[in-house]
Amino acid sequence: MLSAFQLEKNRLTRLEVEESQSLIDAVWVDLVEPDDDERLRVQSELGQSLATRPELEDIEASARFFEDEDGLHIHSFFFFEDAEDHAGNSTVAFTIRDGRLFTLRERELPAFRLYRMRARSQAMVDGNAYELLLDLFETKIEQLADEIENIYSDLEKLSRVIMEGHQGDEYDEALSTLAELEDIGWKVRLCLMDTQRALNFLVRKARLPGGQLEQAREILRDIESLLPHNESLFQKVNFLMQAAMGFINIEQNRIIKIFSVVSVVFLPPTLVASSYGMNFEFMPELKWSFGYPGAIIFMILAGLAPYLYFKRKNWL
């Protein structure tokens, strides 16, 4: 899908590209999974070649942040959650050339959707491609900050479930959610660090206007403040995971202790029963009239003795 926006009194307005309106006035050209015709149109009208899928997936720094005859290129991760609430990072290719911003992505992303909604009512300050790029990065960081807050809130709920130590379906679900939150936190951290690298490259390589230079530095400060919070999430997740494993081990030890006590309690009666169950011709007790009840009483006493001993030692 191809979308294009122009500036009117420092406000973004959408160009009707479906009606064959020229892209020449566009300050922002946004492409989501473009087909060959859309790629060809951008190439023919604006002379801009677009990154291929393998180039988007390349993770080397030299392939993600560079400058060539086609402009300044930045490939950056954006966080998203799919329809099944599975978290992921999707690469967006940014290119700035001749005062125009090109964005190429493989899916619709929350940060882009939120920025377009804001742009309808908010005017830009300087109205240039760099401000557009930084506004998108700013929106991304806000989204990541919200995601960190959501993880904190979820961890508080999980903490109460885990610390109660009552194992069951709710406990199993808490452990599964804990692993999922750890994965989300890792993806958020990757996105923050990638954005930090992208902004450092932009500050070094691009001749940013004064307003955008300060905006970039402000976003970098926001990232610096979020990274420790993100790190503390991993520590909290690790603590809760260890606590959960500790409670599980305690419960398992309790079960094993019960089996151990049962086996020890039944061992002496079993010894008595096996002794009198031996098939020998000369066994004096076989001729006793009270031999059988006496053996039963002896077996009961042999079982009670270790049980009472364990009870006295507080092993039960």
From Swiss-Prot:
Keywords assigned by UniProt, alphabetized: Cell inner membrane, Cell membrane, Cobalt, Ion transport, Magnesium, Membrane, Nickel, Transmembrane, Transmembrane helix, Transport
TM helices/strands, residue ranges: 255-273, 288-310
Location in or out of the cell: Cell inner membrane
GO MF annotations in UniProt: cobalt ion transmembrane transporter activity; magnesium ion transmembrane transporter activity; nickel cation transmembrane transporter activity
Pfam families (alphabetical): CorA
Reported effect, residue 280 to A/R/W/Y: Reduces magnesium transport by about 99%
Record-linked InterPro entries: CorA_cytoplasmic_dom (IPR045861), CorA_MIT (IPR050829), CorA_TM1_TM2 (IPR045863), Mg/Co-transport_prot_CorA (IPR004488), MgTranspt_CorA/ZnTranspt_ZntB (IPR002523)
Topology feature Periplasmic, residues: 274-287
Residue interval(s) of motif Probable selectivity filter: 277-279
A single cellular component GO annotation: plasma membrane
Recorded superkingdom: Bacteria
Result for mutant: residue 276 to A/F: Reduces magnesium transport by about 99%
Stated regulation of activity: Inhibited by cation hexaammines.
Expression triggers: Constitutively expressed.
Site for Essential for ion permeation, residues: 253
Principal subcellular localization: membrane
Membrane topology listed for this record: Multi-pass membrane protein
Recorded catalytic activity of this chain's protein: Mg(2+)(in) = Mg(2+)(out); Co(2+)(in) = Co(2+)(out); Ni(2+)(in) = Ni(2+)(out)
Residue ranges, Cytoplasmic side: 1-254, 311-316
Subunit structure: Homopentamer. In the absence of Mg(2+), interactions between subunits are weakened, and dimers, trimers and tetramers can be observed in vitro. Homotetramer.
Extra remark beyond the main annotation: Is the dominant magnesium transport system under laboratory growth conditions.
Protein function: Mediates both influx and efflux of magnesium ions. Can also mediate cobalt and nickel uptake, albeit only at extracellular concentrations that are toxic to the cell. Does not transport iron. Alternates between open and closed states. Activated by low cytoplasmic Mg(2+) levels. Inactive when cytoplasmic Mg(2+) levels are high.
Notes concerning its domains: The central ion permeation pathway is formed by the first transmembrane domain from each of the five subunits. Mg(2+) binding strengthens interactions between subunits and leads to the formation of a symmetrical homopentamer surrounding a closed ion permeation pathway. Co(2+) binding also induces a conformation change. Low Mg(2+) concentrations trigger both a conformation change within each subunit and a loosening of the interactions between subunits. This results in an open ion conduction pathway. In addition, this results in a less symmetrical shape of the whole complex.
Family: Belongs to the CorA metal ion transporter (MIT) (TC 1.A.35) family.
The protein's name in its UniProt record: Magnesium transport protein CorA
Natural source organism: Salmonella typhimurium (strain LT2 / SGSC1412 / ATCC 700720)
Lineage, opening ranks: Bacteria, Pseudomonadati, Pseudomonadota, Gammaproteobacteria, Enterobacterales
